[in-house]
């Protein structure tokens, strides 16, 4: 959650955390799904992709390389929707560079 907060990405739902029927109805409002642990949410993400056309990212954001790859995937997904809905694009490379500068 901290990574998404750092990137100013609003979280729609975290499932199964707080998984009420009302919360589950909100799932299709997300621009994409992040599946940080394939063992837990991959089947749900595949279902949402099939039923609602929602893309998903299934990179586990652990370690410098995978965190950077995950952020770049999120940037790509956001930049597909953001210019249409918010009339702007995001660039997370400065964040990646700042986080990995001394590694």
Curated annotation (Swiss-Prot):
Subunit structure, as described in the record: Protochlorophyllide reductase is composed of three subunits; ChlL, ChlN and ChlB. Forms a heterotetramer of two ChlB and two ChlN subunits.
Note on cofactor: Binds 1 [4Fe-4S] cluster per heterodimer. The cluster is bound at the heterodimer interface by residues from both subunits.
Record GO biological process: light-independent chlorophyll biosynthetic process; photosynthesis
Gene3D superfamilies, alphabetized: Nitrogenase molybdenum iron protein domain (3.40.50.1980)
Main enzyme class: oxidoreductase
Record EC number: 1.3.7.7
The reaction(s) this protein catalyses: chlorophyllide a + oxidized 2[4Fe-4S]-[ferredoxin] + 2 ADP + 2 phosphate = protochlorophyllide a + reduced 2[4Fe-4S]-[ferredoxin] + 2 ATP + 2 H2O
Family: Belongs to the ChlB/BchB/BchZ family.
Cellular compartments annotated: Plastid, Chloroplast
Cofactor names: [4Fe-4S] cluster
GO cellular component terms, semicolon-separated: chloroplast
Keywords, comma-separated and alphabetical: 4Fe-4S, ATP-binding, Chlorophyll biosynthesis, Chloroplast, Iron, Iron-sulfur, Metal-binding, Nucleotide-binding, Oxidoreductase, Photosynthesis, Plastid
GO MF, one annotated term: metal ion binding
Keyword DNA damage attached: no
Domain of life: Eukaryota
Keyword ATP-binding on entry: yes
Involved pathway(s): Porphyrin-containing compound metabolism; chlorophyll biosynthesis (light-independent)
Primary location recorded for the protein, binned into one broad class: plastid
Protein name in the entry: Light-independent protochlorophyllide reductase subunit B
InterPro entries, per database record: ChlB/BchB/BchZ (IPR050152), Nase/OxRdtase_comp1 (IPR000510)
Its job: Component of the dark-operative protochlorophyllide reductase (DPOR) that uses Mg-ATP and reduced ferredoxin to reduce ring D of protochlorophyllide (Pchlide) to form chlorophyllide a (Chlide). This reaction is light-independent. The NB-protein (ChlN-ChlB) is the catalytic component of the complex.
Protein's gene: chlB
């Amino acid at each position: 959650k901290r990574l998404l907060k750092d990137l100013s990405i609003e979280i729609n739902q975290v499932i199964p955390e707080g998984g009420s029927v009302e919360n589950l109805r909100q799932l299709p409002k997300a621009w994409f799904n992040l599946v940080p642990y394939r063992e837990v949410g991959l089947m749900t993400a595949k279902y949402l992709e099939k039923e609602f056309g929602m893309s998903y990212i299934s990179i586990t954001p652990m370690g410098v390389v995978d965190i950077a790859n995950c952020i770049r995937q999120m940037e790509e997904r956001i930049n597909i929707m953001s210019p249409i809905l918010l009339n702007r694009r995001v660039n997370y490379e400065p964040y990646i560079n700042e986080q990995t500068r001394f590694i």
